[in-house]
Amino acid sequence: MLFRYLVWLFRFIKVKNVASISLLVIGSNYLTTAIANNTSISPTTSSNHITTAIPNNTSILPTTSSNHITTAISNNITDKDDYTHFSTDKTISDSLTPITLYRAIRSTLNDTGTKTMTDHGLTRPYRPTTVIFHSDTSLPVKNATRDNSIKKIYRQVISFFIQSNPLFPCFKNHEVFLNLANILNTILCIILIKNV
């Protein structure tokens, strides 16, 4: 049912250019589903669904759901490895950390070719994280992410998911980070290009 809705949504969205970008986050008050290694996604949602949009001014407006508030993301995004809010679970791999996946995804911003997670020392292939549609075609525009403004916003999107977020507590788990690229492309996030 959700897939049909997304197809309908894309059919009725008029895309004019790739100058601005917004992220539509379809989630719930608490998303407690663990994403399995087979990349199947079956979210268990609560009664209160929320929709959070990231506007093209590169900031995330506060969204209140019950007693939980998501605040704006800072522009400071660093590569340091000491993210204390990440899980220290070692069941996946000692060499696999959320920041490693973050770097792998971020490296796709400067790459117009097709990459896999194994190219970055990770364990499974993934589709291109950034899905951008041109005005006259439904195919992804591979070089659209080379625009600096899109890079800046997209990096903030990644920061939104890798930081400790009470709205999506399951993202603290390494197993979920293994499928972050698929999540961004399917259930939780839809990247839309709209007018400036």
From Swiss-Prot:
Belongs to the asfivirus I196L family. Sequence repeats lie at residues 28-48, 49-68, 69-87. It comes from African swine fever virus (isolate Pig/Kenya/KEN-50/1950) (ASFV). It comes from the Viruses. This is Late protein I196L. Keywords: Late protein, Repeat. The keyword Lipid metabolism does not apply. Induction: Expressed in the late phase of the viral replicative cycle.
